[in-house]
Design a protein with these regions (language model features):
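Active-site-proximal helix/loop segments of hydrolytic enzymes
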Residues: 1-162
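Long, low-complexity, intrinsically disordered segments
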Residues: 157, 161, 166-175
Length: 175
């Protein structure tokens, strides 16, 4: 968030910055990723799952006033933006997305993001997106073949929670 869009308030003698103008999630992908198509497909699925749970994406990354923080919206249906400079997105050999689950400079959204309920909503959306992605690609997240031809395949995303935070999701083949 550019400094010119932030406002200040003092709380217990400490200066804080905020901007209540924008709220919502954002999903980022890189055109330089080795599996750009897979990244876009997963980003689309993730955005759709978040929207099914009544979350909305933030459009502010497309505004000129964002300056160097401005990003091209590549999937307006799902809230997926292009972010080529981010190493973790562009240098991986597998599909990759970055999920910004909300805007913590928005005071109300920061409070919502801190609740176990909101974390669970986001974790459930990520889980469903991983399940859909694995099922549609016929492979595990690691890129291995899913099973022997002719066998019925079922996929399940496993999710573990520790202190209310979702840990990495693993796509597992179930026979």
């Amino acid at each position: 968030m550019p400094d010119n869009l932030k406002e200040t308030w003092e709380d217990q003698g400490k200066k804080n910055y905020y901007s209540d103008r924008f709220s919502g999630y954002a999903i980022f992908v890189s055109n330089d990723n080795a599996d750009r198509t897979g990244s876009l497909a997963f980003g689309h699925s993730l955005g759709q799952e978040l929207q099914k749970r009544s979350l909305h994406y933030t459009p502010h990354y497309t505004f000129a006033l964002m300056g160097r923080y401005r990003h091209e919206l590549v999937d307006a249906d799902a809230g997926v933006y292009r972010y080529d400079q981010l190493i973790v997105l562009r240098r991986t050999l597998m599909p990759a997305v970055l999920l910004e689950a909300g805007s913590i400079v928005n005071r109300q959204e920061e409070l919502e993001l801190a609740t176990p309920e909101r974390r669970l909503i986001v974790a459930d959306a990520v889980t469903a997106a991983v399940e859909n992605f694995c099922a549609n690609r016929g492979q595990t997240v690691a890129g291995r073949s899913a099973s022997k031809p002719g066998k019925r395949r079922k996929y399940r995303a496993l999710q573990r929670h520790q202190a209310g935070v979702a840990l990495p999701l693993i796509c597992e083949l179930r026979r």
